[in-house]
Every structure is written in structure tokens, then in C-alpha cells.
């Protein structure tokens, strides 16, 4: 049995695409992530009831990844909060909130801490203040804390692994971390060492550089973690 949960994103660009999605393709995933930032706000609102009905047997993470953190949608703080509040009416298992980009929205959603994956994405580097950022995010008391950063050299990946391990030992097993790009692939399958509790895998199109396919991720984690659970 695997320790690390596998999250697989679904990135739909048109309302009609949902009909073509086969739920059975995601059976190997522990969590389905609806990356809604490829749709307009109005289309998100229209698709939401259909999406949650279609994946009612799955655990769902809702993510609205903004341009500022590597995503595809640019919205005001007010609109960002409005979208998240509307989605919460459908009772998702988890909802991503960009902590440093949308602090006011997080403040308005603190009553949903048990559902929140508090996130931070840096597509330029592994920041030198990453540990202090993780501590600050941890102190907010959300279900999970997620960071995705871009390594420039091998030691950046090793630093992230060590930081994740240190945070897990000190504060508990609710951290999700990954180094992006091909250089960072090791971080996506080393949760059994670092304590990172989720990894993100792709079914077809990856949602982040360096993402490994669902099939390969299942095979690798089964090999690495099967005797550890």
C-alpha cells in the first residue's frame, strides 16, 4: 500500500470537453484535481455542478491557478474569492488557496481550514526564505501546505528534500513539496523519504514541468513504497 497520494489534474478549456472525460481513466488516482483556470469565471460556475456530479465517487481538489503563480487565469481579489466561495457550495474535499498571492481571500476562508491546501509556487528559483515561508503557512492551521519551486542546479533539489524532511519531522505530515522541471523529478517520487504526502501526475497533458505520467508514477511508488506502509 502506498503512503504517497497521487493527484491527477484535469484541465478543461471548454464546457463541452467534460462530456468526453472518462472517469475510469482516473481510477488509479487518489485525488482528482480540477484545474479550472483554463475556463472563464462564468464557465466555471456553469461546469461546477456537472463536474462534481461526474466525479462524485472521487476525492476532488479544486484549483484556480492564477497567472502570478504559473497558471492561466488573471482575476481580481474579489473575483478570486467569489469563485472559491461558489465552489465551496459543492463541498469539495480540498480547495487550493494561493497564500502569498491571495492573502485576503485566505483570511475570508479561514473557517474552511480543514479543506484548504495552502499553496506557494515559484517558477524562477528555490527561494532562500523557503523554510520561513513554510513555517508561516503551517501556522495557519490548514489541512495541507504545498510548495512547488524551480531548481537551478542539483543542490537545489537536495535542499528542498531536506527542508521538507525537516518540516515534516518538526511539524507533522501535512506538507506537499516538489521541485519542478526534469531536474526536480526525484522530488515527485521521494515522499517516502521526505514526508511529502502528495505527488502530482499527468494523465495526458501535464499541469507543471517535470510531471510524471500517472501510469509511471503508480509503478514507481508501488515499487518504492509497497513494503513501507
Swiss-Prot record:
Residues the record lists as binding 3-dehydroquinate: 33-35, 65, 188, 207, 211
EC supergroup of this enzyme: lyase
Entry protein name: 3-dehydroquinate dehydratase
Gene (name only): aroD
Positions of the catalytic residues: 121 (proton donor/acceptor), 146 (schiff-base intermediate with substrate)
Any GO MF annotation of the entry: 3-dehydroquinate dehydratase activity
SS bond partners: none
Family, similarity comment: Belongs to the type-I 3-dehydroquinase family.
Amino acid at each position: 500500500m502506498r503512503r504517497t497520494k497521487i493527484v491527477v489534474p484535469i484541465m478543461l478549456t471548454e464546457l463541452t470537453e467534460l462530456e468526453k472525460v472518462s472517469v475510469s481513466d482516473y481510477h488509479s488516482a487518489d485525488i482528482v484535481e480540477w484545474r479550472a483556470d483554463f475556463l472563464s469565471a462564468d464557465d466555471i460556475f456553469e461546469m461546477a455542478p456537472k463536474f462534481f456530479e461526474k466525479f462524485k465517487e472521487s476525492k476532488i481538489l479544486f484549483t484556480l491557478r492564477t497567472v502570478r503563480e504559473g497558471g492561466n487565469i488573471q482575476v481580481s481579489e474579489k473575483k478570486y474569492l467569489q469563485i472559491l466561495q461558489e465552489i465551496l457550495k459543492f463541498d469539495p474535499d480540498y480547495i487550493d488557496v494561493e497564500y502569498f498571492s491571495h492573502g485576503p481571500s485566505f483570511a475570508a476562508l479561514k473557517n474552511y481550514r480543514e479543506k484548504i491546501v495552502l499553496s506557494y509556487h515559484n517558477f524562477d528559483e528555490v527561494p532562500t526564505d523557503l523554510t520561513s515561508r513554510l513555517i508561516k503557512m503551517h501556522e495557519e492551521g490548514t489541512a495541507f501546505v504545498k510548495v512547488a519551486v524551480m531548481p537551478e542546479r542539483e543542490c537545489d533539489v537536495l535542499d528542498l528534500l531536506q527542508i521538507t524532511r525537516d518540516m515534516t519531522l518538526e511539524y507533522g505530515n501535512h506538507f506537499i513539496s516538489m521541485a519542478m522541471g526534469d531536474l526536480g523529478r526525484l522530488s515527485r517520487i521521494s515522499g517516502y523519504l521526505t514526508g511529502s504526502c502528495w505527488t502530482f501526475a499527468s494523465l495526458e497533458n501535464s499541469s507543471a514541468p517535470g510531471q510524471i505520467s500517472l501510469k509511471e508514477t503508480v509503478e514507481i511508488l508501488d515499487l518504492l513504497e509497497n513494503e513501507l506502509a
